[in-house]
Amino acid sequence: MKKAVVLLSGGMDSAAVIAMAQEQGFAVHALSVRYGQRHTSELDAAARVAKAQGVIAHKTVDVDLRSIGGSALTDDIDVPEAGGAGIPVTYVPARNTIMLSLALGWAEVLGANDIFCGVNAVDYSGYPDCRPEFVAAFQALANLATKSGVEGAGIKVHAPLQFLSKGQIVSEGVRLGVDFGLTVSCYNADANGAACSHCDACRLRAQGFTEAGVADPTLYA
């Protein structure tokens, strides 16, 4: 069976991506990153999702981005209750670049030719590293910067949620049997994973279930 590395945050998007990769016949190796995020309950959620969805392996890598700072998700900066103009304070500098680079490295070690991520450019918070241009640029990097890219078949970067709305993501996940009740999306989630219901991540998540006509399984504080 062909192997793939899938980035798994513990949120609803990455849970859906795992199911999509499995439907395509991939043996999924899930990769989570402990980057110093304040909402560590998402990593507990990642472990639950990995177990429930039967991945081949689940690895958590430590890269402490608190030493760099610059984000409300790592620093002592308040998370806003509503999205505003421009790039929000919840943007973590270079996070997706770092995470995809780790996935790329693990894929090379595993001999995998595919990596998956859950970036989304439709219903998202304005992050520059969720845009289609970013995914295309990282694909070019993967082609140039890896042994596999230079000597072999290369490593393909998949972003299957890129042009889906949150409602479409929920519908697709439900079709594939994803238990979204296991996931955590909230930027302010407590130690038990209970969501605040006010932040932008909570707003987008609730919007997705409403659009899909699916009961929201989220645990709220």
From Swiss-Prot:
Gene3D superfamilies hit by this protein: HUPs
UniProt KW keywords: ATP-binding, Ligase, Metal-binding, Nucleotide-binding, Queuosine biosynthesis, Zinc
Positions bound to ATP: 8-18
Transmembrane segments: none
Cofactor (UniProt): Zn(2+)
Keyword Zinc: yes
Binding-site positions, Zn(2+): 186, 196, 199, 202
Domain of life: Bacteria
GO molecular function: ATP binding; ligase activity, forming carbon-nitrogen bonds; zinc ion binding
Any Pfam family hit: QueC
Cofactor, free-text remark: Binds 1 zinc ion per subunit.
EC number(s) given by UniProt: 6.3.4.20
UniProt-listed InterPro entries: QueC, Rossmann-like_a/b/a_fold
GO biological process: queuosine biosynthetic process
EC top class, as a word: ligase
Biological role: Catalyzes the ATP-dependent conversion of 7-carboxy-7-deazaguanine (CDG) to 7-cyano-7-deazaguanine (preQ(0)).
Membership in a protein family: Belongs to the QueC family.
Name of protein: 7-cyano-7-deazaguanine synthase
Organism: Stenotrophomonas maltophilia (strain R551-3)
Species lineage: Bacteria, Pseudomonadati, Pseudomonadota, Gammaproteobacteria, Lysobacterales
